[in-house]
């Protein structure tokens, strides 16, 4: 018996037993091997956990980058197509164009649903009541944007869109407990400065002429002598002077005051100033209307983004749901507003869609409807995987290629003002991005000091403040899959 036992102890373990980490008589193994095996298993588990966490963070980052790039491409293409569609002073059917775009978008998404490519959540009355205000605001966002784009060049339009970022940031400060750091505030100052620089050619001359004309109007009332205003209203003054001195070829500046002439001269000057002011108003009304529409668009866009972020949490909509129901619920609003505001007569259609450009315009509208699907989806995607402020920041950084596209496709003039304005706006976007990055890092360091967690940028998403990047698997392309 002792010989058998000795022989069994000398039999080496087979490969399967070695692979399983035990021998045939592992119960008599030395106790010193147990802590080593436990340590080895814990190291393997730690490495595996870190690998999976880094993989998920990499997936989230790649998904966020994909969302940002997709939104940039959609934004540039939609702006160029819409500018081509509504460009021109005589185009008056913006709401009809938006109605066609939304209808094309709904048809495309519904076709994708019927082919089984995506799934769309079934709509109920609760979701309709929750989401209908969002769709109504989207109508006003797109409409005011199209009107501003109709009256403004693309570089100026893109610069003023930066002001939306400021409104969104302060909205997040009030609604989502956001925070504005000094560097972020500096970027806001640069954004406002870029807008002032870009708009200076439209704002400065009218102000200077008004002050200049008022000063000389007061002087004319006392002296009775019309004074030149450097080419402004010269035709009116010359005719007035010729009427009072028909036998002289003297210029208005050489006319000497005489008794009793103050009243007719004052009347002539008043008429001259009123006609010149009307002419100046006609020349500047086109760009002035653009600034008014742009201001309205910035305010409504900021409200839309902030309210949309809240409602997405309430409804639990996915990206395709958001895009589909945004456009679907916008159709009745657009139809009602178009019938109420726009004239659907044959003459109006001939005026807005002339025969020589009709086929091109119809194709552009259909193409813009297709692009509307893309931009609606990428907007919701970008907001979901990043934040509403980050989404608007991406739009700010996108202004440089967008402005270049306007100069390239529409021949917008390259002036020192709009060039400097675009450059300052682009720098403001970079400063803002750096400021938000430092804010995220500081928040993570503070959170790690409080919890003892790692300060790595790939740490848990709980360290991110409200409204910032959230590193989870939401970065994947958010499409629905059909349930088996």
Curated annotation (Swiss-Prot):
GO cellular component entries: cytoplasmic vesicle membrane; endoplasmic reticulum membrane; Golgi membrane
Keyword check for Glycoprotein: yes
UniProt subcellular location: Golgi apparatus membrane; Cytoplasmic vesicle membrane; Endoplasmic reticulum membrane
Sequence ranges of Basic and acidic residues compositional bias: 1-12, 19-28
Main localization category: Golgi
Region (Disordered): 1-34
Glycosylation sites: 343
Residues in the Lumenal compartment per record: 82-90, 151-155, 201-287, 343-360, 412-413
Pfam assignment, any one: EamA
ATP-binding among keywords: no
Cytoplasmic topology ranges: 1-60, 112-129, 177-179, 309-321, 382-390, 435-484
Topology in the lipid bilayer: Multi-pass membrane protein
Record InterPro entries: EamA_dom, TPT_transporter
Membrane-spanning intervals of the chain: 61-81, 91-111, 130-150, 156-176, 180-200, 288-308, 322-342, 361-381, 391-411, 414-434
UniProt keyword annotations, A-Z: Cytoplasmic vesicle, Endoplasmic reticulum, Glycoprotein, Golgi apparatus, Membrane, Sugar transport, Transmembrane, Transmembrane helix, Transport
Function comment: Involved in the import of GDP-mannose from the cytoplasm into the Golgi lumen.
Assembly: Homooligomer.
Family: Belongs to the TPT transporter family. SLC35D subfamily.
Protein name (record): GDP-mannose transporter
Organism encoding this protein: Malassezia globosa (strain ATCC MYA-4612 / CBS 7966) (Dandruff-associated fungus)
Lineage of producing organism: Eukaryota, Fungi, Dikarya, Basidiomycota, Ustilaginomycotina
Gene encoding the protein: VRG4
């Amino acid at each position: 018996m002792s010989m058998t036992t000795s022989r069994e102890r000398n039999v080496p373990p087979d490969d399967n037993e070695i692979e399983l980490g035990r021998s045939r008589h592992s119960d008599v193994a030395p106790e010193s091997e147990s802590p080593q095996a436990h340590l080895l298993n814990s190291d393997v588990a730690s490495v595996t956990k870190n690998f999976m966490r880094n993989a998920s963070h990499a997936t989230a980052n790649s998904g966020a980058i994909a969302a940002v790039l997709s939104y940039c491409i959609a934004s540039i293409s939609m702006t160029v197509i819409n500018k081509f569609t509504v460009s021109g002073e005589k185009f008056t059917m913006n709401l009809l164009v938006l109605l066609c775009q939304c209808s094309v978008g709904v048809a495309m998404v519904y076709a994708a649903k019927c082919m089984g490519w995506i799934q769309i959540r079934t709509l109920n009355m609760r979701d309709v009541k929750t989401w209908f205000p969002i769709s109504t605001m989207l109508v006003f966002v797109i409409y005011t944007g199209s009107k501003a784009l109709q009256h403004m060049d693309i570089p100026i339009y893109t610069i003023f869109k930066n002001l939306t970022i400021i409104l969104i940031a302060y909205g997040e400060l009030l609604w989502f407990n956001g925070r504005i750091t000094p560097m972020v505030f500096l970027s806001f100052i640069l954004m406002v400065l870029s807008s002032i620089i870009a708009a200076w050619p439209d704002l400065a001359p009218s102000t200077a002429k008004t002050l200049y004309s008022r000063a000389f109007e007061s002087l004319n009332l006392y002296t009775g002598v019309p004074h030149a205003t450097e080419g402004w209203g010269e035709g009116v003054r010359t005719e007035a002077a010729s009427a009072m001195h028909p036998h002289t070829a003297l210029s208005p500046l050489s006319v000497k005051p005489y008794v009793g002439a103050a009243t007719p001269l004052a009347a002539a000057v008043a008429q001259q100033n009123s006609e010149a002011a009307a002419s100046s108003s006609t020349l500047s009304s086109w760009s002035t209307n653009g600034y008014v529409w742009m201001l309205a668009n910035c305010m409504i866009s900021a409200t839309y983004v902030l309210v949309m972020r809240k409602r997405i949490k309430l409804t639990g909509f996915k990206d395709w749901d958001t895009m589909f129901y945004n456009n679907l619920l916008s159709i009745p609003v657009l139809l009602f507003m178009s019938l109420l505001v726009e004239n659907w007569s044959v003459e109006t259609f001939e005026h807005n869609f002339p025969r020589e450009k009709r086929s091109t315009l119809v194709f552009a509208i259909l193409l813009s409807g297709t692009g509307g699907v893309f931009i609606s989806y990428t907007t919701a995607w970008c907001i979901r995987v990043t934040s509403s402020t980050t989404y608007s920041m991406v739009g700010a950084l996108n202004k440089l290629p967008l402005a270049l596209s306007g100069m390239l496709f529409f021949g917008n003039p390259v002036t020192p003002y709009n060039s400097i304005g675009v450059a300052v706006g682009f720098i403001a976007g970079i400063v803002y991005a750096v400021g938000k990055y430092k804010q995220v890092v500081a928040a993570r360091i503070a959170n790690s000091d409080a919890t003892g967690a790692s300060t790595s940028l790939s740490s848990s998403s709980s360290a991110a403040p409200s409204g910032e990047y959230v590193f989870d698997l939401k970065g994947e392309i958010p499409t629905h899959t059909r349930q088996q």
